[in-house]
Amino acid sequence: MPDKPTKEKLMEQLKGGIIVSCQALPGEPLYSETGGIMPLLAKAAQEAGAVGIRANSVRDIKEIQAITDLPIIGIIKKDYPPQEPFITATMTEVDQLAALNIAVIAMDCTKRDRHDGLDIASFIRQVKEKYPNQLLMADISTFDEGLVAHQAGIDFVGTTLSGYTPYSRQEAGPDVALIEALCKAGIAVIAEGKIHSPEEAKKINDLGVAGIVVGGAITRPKEIAERFIEALKS
């Protein structure tokens, strides 16, 4: 297992490359109760030249770590109804991810009500206090959320949740305006969410982002097939 990179070192690694999100949830075609599928996707991503992997769950991350030394952005998706945040939503999930020695832990940093009752700045401060050497990524949906996370000391701001909160911009593709605004504010941005084509990724890279995550367009074959099928119907 490689040593955990510094922020500067990781930014060098990620610059100008693609981080591939390798995830499948129960009910999706590539989900398996016994595991073994996500590391194959990660291996394919590595062979293609990916600079990092985003993965969900302790099991999947451990399996991916066994086959690649690429830096991993790790999350744990767990629902805490009636609250909506479910991406690394409490310290319990942070603790589980911190034990895996991954490069970055990503967590929901939207302004929505949280299961733990904390505001996002307080949550970030608690995590940083407990794990001062752990790089952190805020999954946000608006500029203001990104700014709050940045001011609380988060290392990277991801546009992951734009379009997935009711109050954020609802775009069919990536929220380029949000990415650009965050970059102009001097924030280390990891662009993520609805990036469907190499052309979109290139356009986003030119904005000066710290990294780009692509998921569905690479690792969700059902979604990819649907895009082709819908195109023929129009």
Curated annotation (Swiss-Prot):
Biological process annotations from GO: carbohydrate metabolic process; N-acetylmannosamine catabolic process; N-acetylneuraminate catabolic process
Keywords: Carbohydrate metabolism, Isomerase
Family indicated by similarity: Belongs to the NanE family.
Top-level taxon of origin: Bacteria
Annotated organism of origin: Streptococcus pyogenes serotype M4 (strain MGAS10750)
SUPFAM superfamilies per record: Ribulose-phoshate binding barrel
EC class: isomerase
Descriptive protein name: Putative N-acetylmannosamine-6-phosphate 2-epimerase
Name of the coding gene: nanE
Catalytic activity: an N-acyl-D-glucosamine 6-phosphate = an N-acyl-D-mannosamine 6-phosphate
Function comment: Converts N-acetylmannosamine-6-phosphate (ManNAc-6-P) to N-acetylglucosamine-6-phosphate (GlcNAc-6-P).
Record lineage: Bacteria, Bacillati, Bacillota, Bacilli, Lactobacillales
Pfam family, one: NanE
